[in-house]
Each structure stands twice: as C-alpha cells, then as structure tokens.
C-alpha cells in the first residue's frame, strides 16, 4: 500500500476527544494561545504531535511503526476563563516515549521543540501528571524530610537559615567568620549564595575549609547540629562531583546545587551521590523566573518543582508569599504541598490540574527566602508549617548589632511563634502582639523589630489564578 504524501491537519490524527487516559500515561496541561485563525483543536493537536511522534508532513516511515501506540493525544480542551484566545489543552503521552529515570529526556520530549511552533502565539506548560510507573524509575530526593530531621535532631518547628551577604567579594576567612556568627547565634543553617562557585576572590576549597571550621566551632558551643549549604555547582559535572566528594571528606551534613543552571543530568547524578554518601542536598532555583514568570508562555514552577522531586533534592526555594519575590498564597501552597506530601488531589483553585500520587518518593522541604524579616515570622510559621526552612539573609545580617544578634532575634521570634501556635493562639490575628511580647525579653529581637517595622514589598503578584 502506498502512503498519501502531503500535509494534513494535525487534528485529524492527534485530536482524540474520545480517548480514555491510561494510568500509565504522562498527562500534561498546556495553556495554548493560538495564532489568529487557528482553531483550538488544531493548536492542541499540533502541541501533541510536535511533542511526540509528529512532524510537519506525512512521512513514509510512519508506516513502519504503530502511531496509535506511540502518538501523544490532545484529549480535552477548555477555554481559559476571562481570556478570549487562550485554552487549556490536555495532552496524554504514552509512557514508552520516555527514558526511565531521566527528567532530561522527559523535558526534551514534552517541551523541547514545540514552544517555538509558528501556529502558536504562546504556550505554557501548567502542570504534569507523572504516573506511578514512571515515578518508580526515579530515586528522588536523597533523604527526604524525616531523615533530615533525624540527622539534625530537630523536631516540631521550622528550620532557620541565612544566606551569607555580600554574596560576592568576601575572602574565605571572612566568609567563614560570618557563617560562624550566624550559627552561633541560633540559626540551623547558613547558605552559599547561588552565584558563589569558585571565583578569584574566594576559591571553593578555601571556602569549604573555613565554613567547615565555622560550623564545627558553632556546633561545639551550642550543642546543636549545624549546617552550611556548600555550593558544589561548577562548570563541569566532574568538577561538581569533586566538590561534593571534598565536602563529604570534611564531614559536613549538607551541600547545594543550582539545578536549573546546572542542568537536570548533573543534578540527578549529584542526588545519587548524596544518597550514597549521607549528604543532604539543598537546591536553589536560579534562573526559574526566566522560565516561569510569564503567565502565558513558559513552564509553571509547579512543573519545575515536580521535576526536582523526581531528579532529587532535599530542600528547594519555593517563594515566600510575604517577602520580595513572586508568589501568590494559594498557588505557592499548591506546589509546597506537591513537594512535601505523598498524595495531592486535583484542585484548580490552587492551580493543581491533576491528582498526583508520589508513591514512596521522599518529600522535599520548601525554603522560604527573599526579603523576609522578624515581623514576617508569624505569617511564615502559619503558612509553611513545621516542615520548612525559613531563610533570612538581609533579615539576619542587616541587624544593627551584627550577625549573631540578628540570628538570636530570628531564633527568639521563631520559638515565640511556635510556642504561641502550640498554645492554640491564632498567629494570623495575633502575630504582631506575639513578636512584641517576645521582644520584651530579647533586646536583640527588640532592635530587629525597630529596624524593619516599616518595610513592605507590596506589589500585585503576576502569577495569579485565572
């Protein structure tokens, strides 16, 4: 039988509204903005085709395979409320299209090519449903929430962190000194900034040594286990692994990686190393806003968060709801739950398009960081709950008396909020009063309250629900 050459409409092959999705399919929800004159069915089918088996014309080699078995299918389309030309197109991909245990391959297939497609004005991947059969091919986070608590011996409260500033320009010795003061004052963690790798003013090995010295000294003085996120991100995977190995030899509890700039392949390798060697892995999302900030084009952060849980990381930055960085409350809590919980029900009011079962993949601790200070502590404790890291960079180091008093102020504020919550008080309503009461017993907290009493970062969130 000859084949019929020529171009035919995508929707004839790839738009299948009668299709019943399988438990093993990867499901995607795309926000599609077609070019004027392109019907939504054709646009949705084009997305399904270009991200699976299709190309722009019929090819004779189609006859050598079973398209029905391997093609992506656009199985449902709904208009976006309040928009005239946007649609949510649901696409189902057969599992055989993807390499096991490879986030890299999953993204190359689903978002690799189709975003430059001419028939679309814009395209955004809003959510993915990863089937359990595929999840079981991933190791996921090196340790997860419970193992981390056991390693640190810290229970019943959020953990406190601080990014060392100025992020660039300090010598290794002064950097270590700043780390020591923060940890000595009562923080659980300090953090390398995401762009601290190994620059001329501070090479990585020197930084690792001085930070290790700082955290052992703080540990001995406070009797608490301390950590510093040593950034192992590097220009090559081999160099990254070398840094991770050195961190393990120093006996530190945690290292760090920039997973988007470093790449999923590097990140997954590092996560495997961390599990095999007992290191916790802190993940920074540098570059995420390039991908996720536009409402009608790109990839929503909840998808990047799911991908990170599969690739592997014990902490990930996830917005604050109250600080200087983007994040609306319901949406942020939607992907915070995606990171922590075993099972998440579909809930469109929180931007969750699919029910997701993580089976036995460990959870990831969300990190709230960016423009937060002691007055935010009640809100953060209430919004994020115990399984979170609250990270105050300027909110620690900007204290008028220095780093250690800044750390004391944050720890006192946190302990006051946790105690008030445990006594049944309403943190949302009484937050300011709780902080004021605590500041009577802590001059460090009183000074912090005074400095930041007027600060607000009030802008309308870009990332809103429809």
UniProtKB/Swiss-Prot annotation:
Residue sites binding Mg(2+) per the record: 191, 193-194
Site (Transition state stabilizer): 324
Keywords: Calvin cycle, Carbon dioxide fixation, Chloroplast, Disulfide bond, Lyase, Magnesium, Metal-binding, Methylation, Monooxygenase, Oxidoreductase, Photorespiration, Photosynthesis, Plastid
Record-linked InterPro entries: RuBisCO, RuBisCo_large_chain_AS, RuBisCO_lsu_C, RuBisCO_lsu_C_sf, RuBisCO_lsu_fd_N, RuBisCO_lsu_N_sf, RuBisCO_lsuI
Necessary cofactors: Mg(2+)
Cofactor binding mode and count: Binds 1 Mg(2+) ion per subunit.
Source organism, top-level taxon: Eukaryota
Its job: RuBisCO catalyzes two reactions: the carboxylation of D-ribulose 1,5-bisphosphate, the primary event in carbon dioxide fixation, as well as the oxidative fragmentation of the pentose substrate in the photorespiration process. Both reactions occur simultaneously and in competition at the same active site.
UniProt protein name: Ribulose bisphosphate carboxylase large chain
Originating species: Proboscidea louisianica (Louisiana Devil's-claw)
Higher taxonomy: Eukaryota, Viridiplantae, Streptophyta, Embryophyta, Tracheophyta
GN (gene name): rbcL
């Amino acid at each position: 039988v000859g084949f019929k050459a020529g171009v035919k409409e995508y929707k004839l092959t790839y738009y299948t509204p009668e299709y019943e999705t399988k438990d093993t399919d990867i499901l995607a929800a795309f926000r599609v903005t077609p070019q004027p004159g392109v019907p939504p069915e054709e646009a949705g089918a084009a997305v399904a085709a270009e991200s699976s088996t299709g190309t722009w014309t019929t090819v004779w080699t189609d006859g050598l395979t079973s398209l029905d078995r391997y093609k992506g299918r656009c199985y449902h389309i709904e208009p976006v409320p309040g928009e005239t030309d946007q649609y949510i197109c649901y696409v189902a991909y057969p599992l055989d299209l993807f390499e096991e245990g490879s986030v890299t391959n999953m993204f190359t297939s689903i978002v690799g090519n189709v975003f430059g497609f001419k028939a679309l004005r814009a395209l955004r991947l809003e959510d993915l449903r990863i089937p359990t059969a595929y999840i079981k091919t991933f190791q996921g986070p090196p340790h997860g929430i419970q193992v981390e608590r056991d390693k640190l011996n810290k229970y019943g409260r959020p953990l406190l962190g601080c990014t060392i500033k100025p992020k660039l320009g300090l010598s290794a010795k002064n950097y270590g000194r700043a780390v020591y003061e923060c940890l000595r004052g009562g923080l659980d963690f300090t953090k390398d900034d995401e762009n601290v790798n190994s620059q001329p003013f501070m090479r990585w090995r020197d930084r690792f040594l001085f930070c290790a010295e700082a955290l052992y000294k703080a540990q001995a003085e406070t009797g608490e286990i301390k950590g510093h996120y040593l950034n192992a991100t590097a220009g090559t995977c081999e160099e990254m692994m070398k840094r991770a190995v050195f961190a393990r030899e120093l006996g530190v509890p945690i290292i760090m990686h920039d997973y988007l700039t470093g790449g999923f392949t590097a990140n997954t390798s590092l996560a495997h190393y961390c599990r095999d060697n007992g290191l916790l892995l802190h993940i920074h999302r540098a570059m995420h806003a390039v991908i996720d900030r536009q409402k009608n084009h790109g990839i929503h952060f909840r998808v990047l968060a799911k991908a990170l849980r599969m690739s592997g990381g014990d902490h990930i930055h996830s917005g604050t709801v109250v600080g200087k960085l983007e994040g609306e409350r319901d949406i942020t809590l939607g992907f915070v739950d995606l990171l922590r919980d075993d099972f998440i029900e579909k809930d469109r009011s929180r931007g969750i398009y699919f029910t997701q079962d993580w089976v036995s993949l460990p959870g990831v601790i969300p990190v709230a960081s960016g423009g937060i200070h002691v007055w935010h502590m009640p809100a953060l404790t209430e919004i994020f709950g115990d399984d979170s890291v609250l990270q105050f960079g300027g909110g620690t180091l900007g204290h008028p008396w220095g780093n250690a008093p800044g750390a004391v102020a944050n720890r006192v504020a946190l302990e006051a909020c946790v105690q008030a919550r445990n006594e049944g008080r309403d943190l949302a309503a009484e937050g300011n009063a709780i902080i004021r009461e605590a500041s009577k017993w802590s001059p460090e907290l009183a000074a912090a309250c005074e400095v930041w009493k007027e600060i607000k970062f009030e802008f309308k969130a870009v990332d809103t629900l429809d």
